[in-house]
Amino acid sequence: MIDLDNIIERLYEKQLIAESVIAYLCSLAKEVLMQESNVVRLSTPITVVGDIHGQFDDLLEIFRIGGPCPYTNYLFLGDYVDRGYYSIETITLLICLKLRYPKRITLLRGNHESRGITQTYGFYSECLRKYGNANVWKYFTDIFDFLTLSATIDDTIFCVHGGLSPSIQHIDQILVLDRFREFPHEGPMADLVWSDPDPSVQEFSLSPRGAGFSFGEVIVTKFLEYNNMKHILRAHQLCSEGYQILFEKKLSTVWSAPNYCYRCANLASILQIDTDQSRFFNVFDAAPNQETPFVEPAAKVTAEYFL
């Protein structure tokens, strides 16, 4: 057995967890995550978090502002790793919280929860640097295949990492997708994590990202009407003010990585939704006094450490 409370406490202190423990945590997490639907039904009150991208100090700031888990019910919209210095600590803490409080934290999959993307944008190299091998990267990227794709809040707000797909008119179509695999380059599963709203278009158009689609207000309105929903909530795009509201308040983007990549000088936000479905974007700046990363010797963190 592993003492999750002890591991969570150590993670809050930014300690690196042993490779053998991470392997065990990931095996436990698969059992929990595989029970979740492709569309997880959630209820208010709830706090929604956008991209984190390995900015661990800012994740701790989110828990300080929004309240600690499990006292606050959290929905994370994906993109936990890459670009920031502490992707390992970030995803390890979130997985531990999911294991400890499975009904109080929901983790969606973002486009960076992918083997291909993480080999390019930092997570893979961070694992090599901190552990001396790619085993931890493999454990976590295997877990990414189990993360759910979307959620609804009070059956009126549709939540996803990226956006909509021309292959999906009804939310029930998401339920039948085979999510337990690496993202394909195209198709509905890719669209959900890659697509973006675009006020300059009305329907679907090819995305400049090279994956997913851009979509306009007509598409958003049709999707909401067809599914008897009121709002779409997503992440995936940097917002200089921490959030953006589009299409006559039918769609919101929440971005939760302040001073993105430690140089963009943007604000961030979390979205707090109350039982009356009122929405409050709690805007915050980067956590103060962020440290330069210190990497422990690989031999030290790969030792057995079962508690």
Curated annotation (Swiss-Prot):
Cofactor note: Binds 2 manganese ions per subunit.
Binding site for Mn(2+) 1: 51, 53, 79
UniProt cofactor(s): Mn(2+)
Catalytic activity, EC: 3.1.3.16
Keyword Chloroplast included in the entry's annotation: no
Residues that hold Mn(2+) 2 according to the record: 79, 111, 161, 236
EC class name: hydrolase
InterPro entries given in the database record: Calcineurin-like_PHP_ApaH (IPR004843), Metallo-depent_PP-like (IPR029052), PPA2-like (IPR047129), Ser/Thr-sp_prot-phosphatase (IPR006186)
A GO BP annotation: asymmetric protein localization to old mitotic spindle pole body
Catalytic activity: O-phospho-L-seryl-[protein] + H2O = L-seryl-[protein] + phosphate; O-phospho-L-threonyl-[protein] + H2O = L-threonyl-[protein] + phosphate
UniProt keyword annotations, A-Z: Hydrolase, Manganese, Metal-binding, Protein phosphatase
Positions of the catalytic residues: 112
Domain of life: Eukaryota
One cellular-component annotation, GO: FAR/SIN/STRIPAK complex
Annotated GO MF terms: metal ion binding; phosphoprotein phosphatase activity; protein serine/threonine phosphatase activity
Keyword Manganese: yes
Protein family according to the UniProt entry: Belongs to the PPP phosphatase family. PP-X subfamily.
Protein name per Swiss-Prot or TrEMBL: Putative serine/threonine-protein phosphatase C22H10.04
